[in-house]
Amino acid sequence: SHDSFSYWVDEKSPVGPDQTPAVKRLARISLVKKLMKKWSVTQNLTFREQLEAGIRYFDLRVSSKPGDADQEIYFIHGLFGIKVRDGLMEIDSFLTQHPQEVIFLDFNHFYAMDEAHHKCLILRIQEAFGNKLCPACSVESLTLQTLWEKKYQVLIFYHCPFYKQYSFLWPGKKIPAPWANTTSVRKLILFLETTLSERAPRGSFHVSQAILTPRVKTIARGLVGGLKNTLVH
């Protein structure tokens, strides 16, 4: 799922570091954050509900929060979401109850995070999943049977050089996710067909992002209606 964590964002929190200075200035105006929330939320199911619905790939974007003294890491999409720790524990609870299920967690955007923040996040991942974490290896050698035999259930993709320091972090290049960046369904389908046919035959997984992306004029036209009412087909 896309922006998998964004079923809840906190409109009372500061605007996230993933936003431009212009958006941050606008957010000081009353009601602007309520409008932002309509465009930040891309899911209406919790992690648990998404898992129960069959989702096994999660697109995750994370950030530190200004003024947060304990170095907690939060999910982010314009506005701050829940703590990463809480989301990971919710996922682990499902996996413990379903020992043959395997999931992909794709940490692909990091904001306002220094080395200490990354270490904190990686520690949270270890604490949540422990021996369920599958070490990085050849994609071709990985089968469900192998995962079941070794009781591995979680593949973590980490789009940051810190992956090199931990055997259970897979490099981001192992799961490319080409992005169409369009509001046109026709262009999106053509893009998906093209990138699928051009994907690497070996050595990596592949994500087909079947999503429409609003442009500035899209948001301006559907400002009050929000993302779901404007782009969901």
Question: What kind of region is each of these model predictions?
Answer:
Residues 1-53, 66-98, 102, 162-172, ...:
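Long, acidic (Asp/Glu-rich), low-complexity accessory segments flanking structured domains
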Residues 47-48, 91-92, 122, 126, ...:
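Short amphipathic alpha-helical segments and helix-helix/interface helices
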Residues 55-56, 131:
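Short aromatic/hydrophobic-glycine micro-motifs
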Residues 56-60, 103-107, 154-158, 206-208:
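Structural recognition of the beta-strand scaffold that forms the well-ordered cores
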Residues 62-65, 107-110, 161:
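An acidic- and aromatic-residue-enriched active-site/binding cleft used to recognize and process polar
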Residues 76-133, 152-154:
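Intrinsically disordered, low-complexity acidic segments that are enriched in bulky aromatics
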Residues 136-233:
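Surface-exposed substrate-engagement region within the catalytic domains
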